[in-house]
Amino acid sequence: NKFTKIFKKIYYKVFIENFNGKLNYDFPNNFYRWDLIEYLIKKNNYTNYLEIGCDQNQLFSKVLIENKIGVDPVSGGNIRKTSDDFFKENVDKFDIVFIDGLHTYKQVKKDILNSVNFLNKNGIILVHDCMPDSLGKQAVPRYKMQWNGDVWKAIVDLRQKENLDIYTCEMDQG
């Protein structure tokens, strides 16, 4: 609605531009996470992809890259275990990591910090579900079908770390 759009513009101006300088990515309305990942892979010649939380492979199946690993304890991907167990055993490095696993602050923060340890130089970590648009979508524990959880708290918290550059894209639930 109109109020939400105005609020988001003001929020962006006050909290994002004032802290980080103006970043302008005019994503088209039909630009989704798989489009962004494909763009980054091609632009940076990435060859190694990790996805945490694959569900039914909605994204994992669309990512075309030389080496890809998908970790999910229930379905999707190609490794059936929790992200914590995966990172304990992993020795591979990745160019691009997409995190869409358990949507809780504590777990997402662990997934991000673990991913940083296995990121190639000039690599990037993308985190989904950072911009819930209602209290119900961010409630923990989950009680709605559509759920972002409190992922956003990990983003706010990790912005305080000096060695990480963190940006939020207003697209596909952030």
State where each predicted segment sits:
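A short alpha-helical cap/connector motif
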Residues: N1-F98, L102-G174
